[in-house]
Amino acid sequence: MKSVVIQQPNALVIEERPLPLPGAGDVRVRIKLAGICGSDSHIYRGHNPFAKYPRVIGHEFFGEIDAVGEGVESTRLGQRVSVDPVISCGHCYPCSVGKPNVCTSLVVLGVHRDGGFSEYA
């Protein structure tokens, strides 16, 4: 699949990457649309201290579920989805009081993990 990859600050390439396989409890999304925002620009320019490189940016994206991992109902296949890029643990204190945005294990797609500027995520 083709992906937009920030190799390091100010160095962007379109790269061929392997098709991701969904893990247990996960789905794979065939990306239809992805938006770009200031956060992506900051990662490109090297102004986001949390970004790790190389990185597929894009945390605002929409698509269709085309594969499911173990434990996910096959009825999800074909569903259109808008992706919430913030992944929280659900168990730490901030998560337990309804503040998953400050989870102690917070992961953001397009920042800590590859995001939506690919054909699949």
Write out the residue ranges for each language-model feature.
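NAD(P)H dinucleotide-binding glycine-rich loop of Rossmann-like/cofactor-binding domains
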Residues: 89-121
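Short N-terminal binding/cap micro-motifs at the start of the first secondary-structure element
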Residues: 11-14, 38-39
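Short Gly/Pro-enriched turn/cap motifs at secondary-structure boundaries
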Residues: 7, 18-19, 52-58, 109-113
